[in-house]
């Protein structure tokens, strides 16, 4: 469940410079389960690679006590990276960016662990 996870990687497309409505709805619906956890974004879209969508949702994350990390993987013109078999094939640069994102997310997750422990003690 969301409550049991320590960090999240949100993957979102960009619709008119905003994230997917389903992402915003999930964030709002599970309000109490997000607190004191790190979050990262992999976004995709046209020329911006979905970066506007990721930036637009970050204020909501902070209101929910999620910590969005600065690293992000933005995949521009993503349809060019889908093979005939339907498999997504990232560029080498995108794969390296994803590795860096996950490493940084792990650091933030560890740094926020004391806050999660304190919050669970306060609730229990």
What residues fall within each predicted segment?
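Glycine-rich phosphate/pyrophosphate-binding loop and the adjoining helix
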Residues: 69-124
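Helix-loop-strand module that forms the ligand-binding subsite of alpha/beta enzymes
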Residues: 1-67
């Amino acid at each position: 469940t969301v409550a049991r996870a320590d960090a999240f990687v949100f993957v979102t497309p960009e619709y008119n410079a905003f994230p997917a409505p389903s992402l915003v709805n999930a964030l709002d619906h599970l309000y109490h389960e997000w607190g004191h956890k790190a979050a990262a974004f992999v976004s995709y879209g046209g020329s911006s690679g979905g970066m506007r969508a990721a930036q637009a949702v970050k204020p909501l994350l902070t209101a929910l006590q999620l910590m969005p990390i600065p690293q992000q993987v933005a995949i521009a013109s993503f349809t060019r990276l889908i093979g005939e078999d339907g498999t997504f094939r990232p560029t080498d640069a995108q794969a390296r960016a994803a590795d860096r994102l996950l490493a940084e997310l792990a650091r933030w997750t560890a740094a926020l662990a004391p806050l999660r422990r304190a919050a669970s003690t306060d609730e229990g």
